[in-house]
């Protein structure tokens, strides 16, 4: 779906505007309130720190949620019966599964790398303190997270067979994943029991990986 693909390319820019508008001041106030009285930092340094946190939040969430949206094709093929045509063709099931995986991986990588470029451009305007090595690490982080997001969406979508089911799962992932992985709120603010639960989720470590390189 070319229309959906090009619309998805615009989504990171919209997300960045929303994050910077609503979360930027929250992050900034949080940093300022945690500093000792009488201790000050340069404005561009604080802005760079906030920008790095916003960038890590967007990338950590997008790499997984975009993968779910990209992988909707697998469920759509089940819903409209296309999978039956593919099943009777001389193609192994493993080849078909890998085709869905790599198609989702490639489209998600394109969108997420566009998101990374937009985020880096935003950070360059408000306060750039990221080294070239960290930029390379961020590109690697995005690749790893997209592989994880694609694998997770493939596993979950394997059990879905209707448009309603994928819409419900997509809504849940879009609304809840950012909180579960620690992108919107620091895991330290969760209760001790919830902290132990989310520590078993790979997504939390992916968020930490991106945040470490974007705020280094």
Model-derived segments and their meaning:
Residues 2-30, 51-66, 109-112, 172-178:
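Hydrophobic alpha-helical transmembrane segments of multi-pass membrane transport/permease proteins
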Residues 3-4, 95, 165, 196:
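Residue-level recognition of membrane-helix boundary sites in multi-pass small-molecule transporters
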Residues 6, 10, 82-83, 96-105:
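Short hydrophobic alpha-helical segments within the ABC transporter permease transmembrane module
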Residues 18-28, 157-213:
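Transmembrane helix segments
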Residues 30-46:
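Perimembrane loop-to-helix junctions flanking transmembrane segments
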Residues 45-76, 141, 151:
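Hydrophobic alpha-helical transmembrane segments of membrane proteins
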Residues 67-91:
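Transmembrane helix boundary and interhelical loop/hinge segments in multi-pass membrane proteins
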Residues 93, 101-178:
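Alpha-helical transmembrane segments and their short interhelical loops
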């Amino acid at each position: 779906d070319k229309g959906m693909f090009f619309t998805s390319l615009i989504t990171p820019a919209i997300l960045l505007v929303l994050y910077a508008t609503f979360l930027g001041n929250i992050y900034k106030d949080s940093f300022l309130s945690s500093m000792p009285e009488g201790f000050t930092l340069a404005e561009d340094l604080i802005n760079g720190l906030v920008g790095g946190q916003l960038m890590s939040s967007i990338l950590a969430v997008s790499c997984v949620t975009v993968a779910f949206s990209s992988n909707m094709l697998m469920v759509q093929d089940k819903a409209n019966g296309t999978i039956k045509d593919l099943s009777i063709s001389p193609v192994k099931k493993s080849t078909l599964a890998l085709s869905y995986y790599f198609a989702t991986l490639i489209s998600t990588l394109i969108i997420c790398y566009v998101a990374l470029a937009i985020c880096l451009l935003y950070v360059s305007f408000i306060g750039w303190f990221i080294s070239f090595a960290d930029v390379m690490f961020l590109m690697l982080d995005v690749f790893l997270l997209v592989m994880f997001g694609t694998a997770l969406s493939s596993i979950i979508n394997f059990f879905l067979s209707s448009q309603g089911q994928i819409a419900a799962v997509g809504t849940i992932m879009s609304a809840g994943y950012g909180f579960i992985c620690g992108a919107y709120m620091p895991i330290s603010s969760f209760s001790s029991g919830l902290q132990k639960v989310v520590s078993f989720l790979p997504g939390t470590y992916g968020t930490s990986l991106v945040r470490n390189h974007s705020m280094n």
